[in-house]
Amino acid sequence: MEGTSESPVLDEFEVNNNDYDNDFISRFSQNPLNAFSLFTDGNLQEYFMNNSLEKIVIHVVLIVISLCGIKAQTSKIIYVVRLLFWKIYNVINNLVNKVINREKIINHQVVDNRFREFEERFRLLLLQHDKNIAKQDDIVQYNKLDNFAESIKSEFNLKVAEMERRFQELKWRCDMIANKAMNTIVLANTVDSNNKDEKIVFDEGSVVQYNRE
């Protein structure tokens, strides 16, 4: 494929068919030395500010080739130079894309590592919170069991005190019954002893009367 001044060679580097460029090419085609008049007649600073680096390099290449005595068509030279620029552009663009992609990968890895670190810290925080809740639950359960044991102990002490009271009352009643029984037995023995100690006195008159009968 051969580029012409009427059609652009590449999308990235279209031929800028302005008056200045056309004037330069027309003068260069007639006589390469005539191109220097553009630098002398015009402002050199304006030339460098109004033209892209690609165009300036192309102009310089054309002048160098013409001064070296190489007879070549302007369109072919421009096409080759544009291909060279396109290749350089692609290389630089690929390098830039690689650097950008590498930075994206690095940033993605950094973000992923930060996210994993945050996730791990959050998981540890939840575990610590669960442990604290479990400890609090254990303390609550222990307090409940302790209160339950204390209530059973208090109730048991009350039952024991009630049984002791009833035992003392039963003992007192048994002692009363035993004392009454002992008193009754002693009294009965005393009465029997008195009855045995009494003497029987017979009346003589009664005896005589008994004999008569």
From Swiss-Prot:
Glycan-carrying positions: 50
GO cellular component term, pick one: host caveola
MF (Gene Ontology): channel activity; toxin activity
Side of membrane Lumenal, spans: 1-51
Transmembrane segments: 52-74
Main location: host cell
Cytoplasmic face of the membrane: 75-213
Coiled coil spans: none
InterPro entries the record matches: Rotavirus_NSP4 (IPR002107)
Keywords for this protein: Activation of host autophagy by virus, Enterotoxin, Glycoprotein, Host endoplasmic reticulum, Host membrane, Host-virus interaction, Ion channel, Ion transport, Membrane, Secreted, Signal-anchor, Toxin, Transmembrane, Transmembrane helix, Transport, Viral ion channel, Virulence
Intracellular or extracellular location(s): Host rough endoplasmic reticulum membrane; Host membrane, Host caveola; Secreted
PTM section of the record: The N-glycosyl content is primarily Man(9)GlcNAc, with a small amount of Man(8)GlcNAc.
Membrane protein topology class: Single-pass type III membrane protein
Oligomer and partners: Homotetramer. Interacts with the immature particle in the viroplasm. Interacts with host CAV1, early and late in infection. Interacts with host integrin ITGA1/ITGB1 heterodimer. Interacts with host integrin ITGA2/ITGB1 heterodimer. Interaction with microtubules blocks trafficking to the Golgi apparatus.
Stored HAMAP family: ROTA_NSP4
Function: Plays an essential role in the virus replication cycle by acting as a viroporin. Creates a pore in the host endoplasmic reticulum and as a consequence releases Ca(2+) in the cytoplasm of infected cell. In turn, high levels of cytoplasmic calcium trigger membrane trafficking and transport of viral ER-associated proteins to viroplasms, sites of viral genome replication and immature particle assembly. The secreted form acts as an enterotoxin that causes phospholipase C-dependent elevation of the intracellular calcium concentration in host intestinal mucosa cells. Increased concentration of intracellular calcium disrupts the cytoskeleton and the tight junctions, raising the paracellular permeability. Potentiates chloride ion secretion through a calcium ion-dependent signaling pathway, inducing age-dependent diarrhea.
Family (UniProt): Belongs to the rotavirus NSP4 family.
Protein name, UniProt field: Non-structural glycoprotein 4
